[in-house]
């Protein structure tokens, strides 16, 4: 993965903000090999999408807007990219591993519900993710004017 750079037009500064992967395939490979964690997945999603807190159902769990936003982001991202259930679960990284290690547990209910019901159990009450508009324009060099 590479570091993402974000340019601030107001200050002219460039900030290193997030880990960014070249593609969804690269993100999946990094997560599945243990080189990326859940925070890396969320950072990748946040780098490419505007997030709107959205109510969603996942199996028997109702998630009000603003609660379980990480699960909302991951499931919406996976749905947008038509990922299969196993690839979707892998995006939960260490949290999915914790669920797999303790199948009878009560934690991480969104992961457990998705394991049980798959895409048939997921329903969003809106559109949680919207692709960010990327501006690639460089600042004008004042000396050349």
Predicted regions, residues:
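Short, charge-rich, low-complexity alpha-helical interaction segments
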Residues: 33-53
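Long, charge-rich, low-complexity intrinsically disordered regions
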Residues: 25-27
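Short hydrophobic transmembrane-like helices used for membrane targeting/insertion
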Residues: 14-16, 145
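Long, compositionally biased
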Residues: 106-137
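Amphipathic protein-protein interaction modules
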Residues: 60-61, 68-109
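A ubiquitous short alpha-helical element
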Residues: 55-63
């Amino acid at each position: 993965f590479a570091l993402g750079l974000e340019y601030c037009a107001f200050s002219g500064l460039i900030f290193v903000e997030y880990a960014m992967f070249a593609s969804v395939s690269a993100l999946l490979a990094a997560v599945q090999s243990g080189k990326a964690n859940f925070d890396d997945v969320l950072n990748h999603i946040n780098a490419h999408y505007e997030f709107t807190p959205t109510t969603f159902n996942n199996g028997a769990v109702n998630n009000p807007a603003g609660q379980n936003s990480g699960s909302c982001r991951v499931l919406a991202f996976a749905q947008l990219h038509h990922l299969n259930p196993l690839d979707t679960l892998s995006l939960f990284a260490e949290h999915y591993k914790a669920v797999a290690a303790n199948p009878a547990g009560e934690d991480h209910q969104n992961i457990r519900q998705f394991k049980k019901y798959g895409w048939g159990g997921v329903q969003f009450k809106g559109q949680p993710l919207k692709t960010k508009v990327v501006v690639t324009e460089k600042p004008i060099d004042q000396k050349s004017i």
